[in-house]
């Protein structure tokens, strides 16, 4: 018997942004799906508009599993995780152990197929960068949603994430920011009006 998917199903029980007041709580499972949507889009944008040659389907899968180890480690708040290089390095080692534990839960004949999704060492540098871009973009989108709902708790997180996005800047991310991100600050009525015309 394998407990792999029973563990993954518990990602929905792990809340993100645990030290901040949230208008709407976000869990790791739904965050992972949004990161998969965005990473897939970034890969397609890169391929179509900027001469990329990425496997967008694989990128979506990598993004889907990018936080899977948090079912074992929990979601450590970013300011703690990256407080200094030593803590960040040690936390990476903890994540690696958690990834390995998850892989070992699988039947042996399936381990290789999932190892290349769960273990970042199997990602190309380009794949890794794109998933990290999508992850940061989704955190930024969460900030926009919270701020548009009147929650000023996310002001500093938004500023921090703008710096992160600037460091990870790419043509495909610029395109996504210009074409898709403005809608995240609008109400349902505002985004529905355009689609009904």
UniProtKB/Swiss-Prot annotation:
Substrate binds at residues 16-17, 31, 67, 75-78, 135. Its EC number is 3.1.3.89. Pfam families: YfbR-like. Its cofactor is a divalent metal cation. The record marks 16 as: Appears to be important in orienting the phosphate for catalysis. Residues 28-140 form the HD domain. Its main location: cytoplasm. One of its GO terms (cellular component) is cytoplasm. GO terms for molecular function: 5'-deoxynucleotidase activity; metal ion binding; nucleotide binding. It is found in: Cytoplasm. It catalyses: a 2'-deoxyribonucleoside 5'-phosphate + H2O = a 2'-deoxyribonucleoside + phosphate. Keywords: Cytoplasm, Hydrolase, Metal-binding, Nucleotide-binding. It is an enzyme of class 3 (hydrolase). A divalent metal cation binds at residues 31, 66-67, 135. HAMAP family: 5DNU. PANTHER family: 5'-DEOXYNUCLEOTIDASE HDDC2. Belongs to the 5DNU family. Catalyzes the strictly specific dephosphorylation of 2'-deoxyribonucleoside 5'-monophosphates. Homodimer. This is 5'-deoxynucleotidase YE1340.
